[in-house]
Amino acid sequence: MTVKEIYGTDFPVILAPMAGITDLPFRILCKEQGADVMVTEMISAKALFYGNKNTLPLMQTEEEEKPIGVQIFGSEPELMGAMAHKIENKGFSYIDINMGCPVPKIVNNKEGSALMLNPELAGRIVKEVSKAVSLPVTVKFRKGFDDDHINAPEFAQIMEENGAAAVAVHGRTRVQYYTGEADWNIIKEVKKAVSIPVIGNGDIFTGEDAVKMREYTGCDGIMVARGAKGNPWLFREIKAALFGEKIPERPTEEEVISMLLRHAQLSVKYKGEKMGIREMRKHTAWYTTGMHGSSSLRNKVNQVETLEALRELLMR
């Protein structure tokens, strides 16, 4: 399959799945600012199987944010296939398999990035999911598990052999988490190793970074993660840079506050007032980084319980 057949565009700029961050409200904002493709937060195949009540909201989508992929994780091939089949008709454009999460409780269950230590099992998972669904199946993984197990190119080949339509590669090992610099060379190596589309991920914080990654690695698209936290405007900057257009001005403080308030309104709309406002505490910290008086503002936001109180606080 071509990049366009999977993602709907020739060089997709994708909002990476980030647990606890890339929920529906945030995805809508990023889409409005130019992100081409969304992915849900990661969803446990086991939780889906057991009907966990906290899992269903993670699959909530809106027409305006599409195309969107659903990301699942697990270590049991048959269960992964069955759960992928169960959710393939929920309006998603593709199924993404998480093989890059570095969090200890995931890794200790032999899930996420732990699968990079077991390429044979990882391949079986991709094979089962690919057999079970008619949607494209993609895989997100890392450079390797640690410096002694840097195997992304070989791992990508196994993914391709077992039916993956595309892969996304984060240029760090599991042991690195998000420290140090992302190794873009490994993305270039993966691109040479497979014939399926390769999405580059890691250290894209500006439009210039996106252009450099495209030119240096030859990747077929980019995935933006931490750079988007508190900064959905990054996508308009990236799109302008990729198209050789004038880079938009950075948002003013007034625009940041306006976006923060819109984010809060969406959060309350989809999660209810209590949960929606509490969710905004972490987002406020990201939106207001470097802003004059941000520390005091964050402390006050942490005490707020209603949308009206938040609005009054932000509009002072």
Walk through the language-model features, giving the residues of each.
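Active-site beta-loop-alpha junctions enriched in small/polar residues
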Residues: 18-20, 43-45, 73-75, 100-102, ...
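Alpha/beta enzyme core
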Residues: 29-32, 81-111, 120-196
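Residue-level signal for the nucleotide or nucleotide-sugar donor/cofactor binding architecture
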Residues: 75, 117, 251
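Hydrophobic faces of well-ordered beta-strands that scaffold small-molecule active sites
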Residues: 13-17, 38-40, 68-72, 95, ...
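Alpha/beta catalytic cores of nucleotide-metabolism and tRNA/nucleoside-modifying enzymes
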Residues: 1-2, 6-10, 14, 19, ...
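Glycine-rich, positively charged N-terminal anion/phosphate-binding segment
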Residues: 1-3, 9, 18-93
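Short, solvent-exposed helix-helix connector turns and helix-capping sites enriched
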Residues: 52, 118-119, 231, 272
